[in-house]
Amino acid sequence: MFRDRTNLFLSYRRTFPHNITFSSGKAPLGDDQDIEMGTYPMMNMSHDISARLTDERKNKHENHSDALPPIFIDIAQDVDDYLLEVRRLSEQLAKVYRKNSLPGFEDKSHDEALIEDLSFKVIQMLQKCYAVMKRLKTIYNSQFVDGKQLSREELIILDNLQKIYAEKIQTESNKFRVLQNNYLKFLNKDDLKPIRNKASAENTLLLDDEEEEAAREKREGLDIEDYSKRTLQRQQQLHDTSAEAYLRERDEEITQLARGVLEVSTIFREMQDLVVDQGTIVDRIDYNLENTVVELKSADKELNKATHYQKRTQKCKVILLLTLCVIALFFFVMLKPHGGGSGGRNNGSNKYNNDDNKTVNNSHDDGSNTHINDEESNLPSIVEVTESENDALDDLL
């Protein structure tokens, strides 16, 4: 029968790479399957694709087995199941609350028993959640799970899980508490209504029964002995009934007391979580204060260094200013023109020239005397320059 393989071929062509080089068929084909694969390249291609997909599945399975999540992830998932059950029970409890709050004359004892049962189950689920959180906290403190030490990344994940699930548990617990408070407010509205005393009602009924029985006995003319026996039997039955009712009431009170103790333990656990959260906040505040002290000390050191550098900068500026003043005064003194000194130098030079002219005609002794006279004439100008320099230095100081 003819089969259309066009769609299969197109799908293979779209998914398979186009740079595949097929064999030329020189290799010997041993069996019919090899002949078919050599004759039809797409069959060979499909075989390669299936082999490749099989290898990829094996690799994925191996990688998945190597990269399994930590065990505490499975432990924490139990909290999700418990919280889901708490939500379901809370919804049922809210429906029963609404039904019981409607006015009516039917007997609501069944609804009250159902309310107590659902409340007890919700508290049990919350207790299980707290037990799981306590186990996660123990794992986080010991940093070991099933003999294996947790890494830093796993500890961070575990810490985040604790915070997330603690918030979820607290949210569900608050919802349950709000439901109970609303129902208690509804019940407290009937506190001021007159309540009929059960004992008085029973006594009244008993008196009526006794009167009717006495009248009946009188009418029938029964003996006093039979009447006394029946009265004793009736009293014994009433005593047994009252004892059973008393025991039943005591049993209900004990059950309510146990549930109240369970609720109190739940409240204390919530208070423990609040204390732990407050301790964490206080630790963070203490850590931030310590960091602030360290940073303030480093800032104080930097300010002291800056003050020291500022003082040194001022000293350097003063020294530089004085140096510039000295240099300016030095150049001023060197470049200042002196009238008396220059005239003395000119006279001395003229005399020296005249003496040189005379040395041509006179002897060597006369020339030496003239030179001595020239030096003596230059002394006043040198003294004047020295006095001017001293005056400038005095002005600077």
Curated annotation (Swiss-Prot):
TM spans (from-to): 318-338
Boundaries of every t-SNARE coiled-coil homology domain copy: 244-306
Pfam families assigned: SNARE
Residue(s) carrying Phosphoserine: 109
Segments of skewed composition (Basic and acidic residues): 353-374
One BP annotation, GO: intracellular protein transport
InterPro entries: SNARE, Syntaxin, Syntaxin/epimorphin_CS, T_SNARE_dom
Organism: Saccharomyces cerevisiae (strain ATCC 204508 / S288c)
Alphabetic keyword roster: Coiled coil, Endosome, Golgi apparatus, Membrane, Phosphoprotein, Protein transport, Transmembrane, Transmembrane helix, Transport
Broad class of the protein's primary localization: Golgi
Compositionally skewed regions (Acidic residues) per UniProt: 386-397
Function: t-SNARE that functions in transport from the endosome to the late Golgi and on the endocytic pathway.
Designated name of the protein: t-SNARE affecting a late Golgi compartment protein 2
Highest taxon of source: Eukaryota
Entry GO terms, CC: cytosol; endomembrane system; endosome membrane; Golgi membrane; SNARE complex; trans-Golgi network
The keyword Zinc belongs to this UniProt entry's keyword annotation: no
GO molecular function: SNAP receptor activity; SNARE binding
Residues covered by region (Disordered): 341-397
Assembly and interaction partners: Interacts with VPS45.
Hydrolase as UniProt keyword: no
Subcellular location field: Golgi apparatus, trans-Golgi network membrane; Endosome membrane
Family: Belongs to the syntaxin family.
All ranges on the Cytoplasmic side of the membrane: 1-317
